Amino acid sequence: MSNAPLQLQNICKNYGALRVTDDVSLNIEAGELHAIIGPNGAGKTTLIHQISGHAQSDSGRIIFDGQDVSRLPMAERARMGLVRSFQITSILPRFSALENVAIAVQARSGSSFSFFGNASKEPALNDAAMALLSRFGLAARAGVPAGQMSHGEKRQLEIAIALAAKPKLLLLDEPLAGTSHDESQRLINTLQELRKELPIVLIEHDMDAVFALADRVSVLVYGRIIASGSPQSIRDNAEVRAAYLGEEAA
């Protein structure tokens, strides 16, 4: 029996007559950053939805931290430490960066956040939120409304919010999407540090980032995994080149 923190066992998802993920089996090992790549419409985001509980699988099993979480709702999986970011930034734009993170920190503690209060009035909350912002180079932007931050800053903020939940495994859905070159590089540096602390599942279209970061890469095409292995083995795989990467990746 595998000791992998996350095990996907023959999971499928249908939308009407369309099978979006098809018999996907995959283990995410402790200490690895595992990238999932594939063309648009391959089922990558649906797969993340299934893992996180945002969408229920129609069949198959999802084992997380030794427990079958296949039928658990998203909030319960998050409480267990299976935490995701969203492909579309899900921050509170009118609240400051500090307040966004503070809300997440307080939610982790099980208490409600006062939307009319100020995070700085709660020293422990403030300190925890500022520590996360500092880690992402956002301390100087703590008081800025999140809606006024650059796209790259929002993506960093979103990961900081996810980390406030103290995840055991982090699911990241295209964190580099829409970022500038400099913003992308900062995020890559951040992920290089994060991967030392916890396993990460990364959905990403930026192949340079994928091959720089990933320990293993799985390729999803038409809802099925056609290859899984080291970045170099994926580069060298003729079926992958034909289906997705293109011959120029050879």
PLM region descriptions:
Residues S2-A250:
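Glycine-rich phosphate-binding loops of nucleotide-dependent enzymes
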